[in-house]
Swiss-Prot record:
Gene: rlmN
NCBIfam families xrefs: rRNA_mod_RlmN
Name of the protein: Probable dual-specificity RNA methyltransferase RlmN
Domain Radical SAM core residue range list: 97-335
Upper lineage: Bacteria, Bacillati, Bacillota, Bacilli, Lactobacillales
Species this chain originates from: Streptococcus equi subsp. equi (strain 4047)
Family statement drawn from the similarity comment of this UniProt entry: Belongs to the radical SAM superfamily. RlmN family.
Amino acid sequence: MKPSIYGLTRDELIAWAIDNGQKAFRATQIWDWLYRKRVQSFDEMTNISKEFVAILKDSFCINPLKQRVAQESADGTVKYLFELPDGMLIETVLMRQHYGQSVCVTTQVGCNIGCTFCASGLIKKQRDLNSGEITAQIMMVQNYFDKRAQDERVSHVVVMGIGEPFDNYQNVMTFLRTINDDHGLAIGARHITVSTSGLAHKIREFANEGVQVNLAVSLHAPNNELRSSIMRINRSFPLDKLFSAIEYYIETTNRRVTFEYIMLNKVNDGVEQAQELADLTKRIRKLSYVNLIPYNPVSEHDQYSRSPKERVAAFYDILKKNGVNCVVRQEHGTDIDAACGQLRSNTMKKDRQKAAAART
C-alpha cells in the first residue's frame, strides 16, 4: 500500500516536490488542493501537470481509511469505526460542543498501557498509526461536514483515542504540525489537546517542542498504591517522577496542565481521596485543572461502576474548598458505544462470531 500524502508536513512536501524536479510553489498548490479544496483524487488537481500527477499517483494515496461504522447519538456525537489498509480497525469520535466541533483521534491500534478500567486496552497494541493515518481521521470528519454543506469545520482536536500518544511520539508531532499549519486546516494550537497516561520523559520532551498545544495527564488516582493498581504505567513512572516532569513542563512552557480523573464508584471517589488529590496538586494549582469524568461502564471490566452523582458532588466540593480549579466533564454519546475502544471491541467480536458461523 502506498503511503498517504497526509503523512507529510508542508515542509516535507516541498522537499519531496523539489527532489522530483518541481518548484516549491507546486507543493504549496498541492497542499491547497488537499486541505483547502479537500479533493479525494490527484486527478482533481487541475493546475498540476499530468506528468506530475502521475508521479503523485505512483508515490502516494490520499486517504487510506475506509468507514466501517458510524454511530450517531441523540446529542449529535458521532462515533466512527475506520478500517486501515491492513484491515485493522480504529475509532474516531466527533463531539459537538458549544464552542465548536471537536474530534477525538486514535494514535495506535490497541494499547499496552494496561489501565484496568479501559476498553482501549482489551486488545493489546498491534502497531502505531503513521502520521497520515492520524491526519486522515480529521479529514474523514471534515469531508462529512463538507458533504452536509452547512459551513462546518473541525475546530478542536483531542488526541485521546485508542493508544498512548507519547508512545507514538514522532508520528503524533508530525500530525500536530500538519493540522496546525496556517496554509491548511489551520486548527489553532490552543484548540488541540494531547493526553498522556504519564510517560514522564516524553512530557519533558514535549515541553521542549515549543508548541502551544495543550497537555492533559490521565491521573485517575491521588496516590501510588491506588494508581499502580488501576494503571500499570505508574509502576514505571510513579507520581514523584510524573509530577517532576509536569513541573518541568509548566516551568518551561508557562502553560496549564489538565488532569483527567475518571470517577470509579468506591474505588477512587472518596472524600479522603479528594483531599489527597488537592494536596498532590497544591504546588501547581495556579497552572493546573482537574477534569472529573463520569465512567462509561465496560462489560469486560464489570468490577467497576459509575460513581453516583452524590459522590461526585462531594468529591467536587472538597476540591473546590481547597481552591482546585475543577469541572465535571459534560458527557457525550452515552446512548452509543461510548467508552473509548468499545465500538472497536464490539465490532471485532461480531466479526469473529460471523466468521465462526460461516465455518460451521
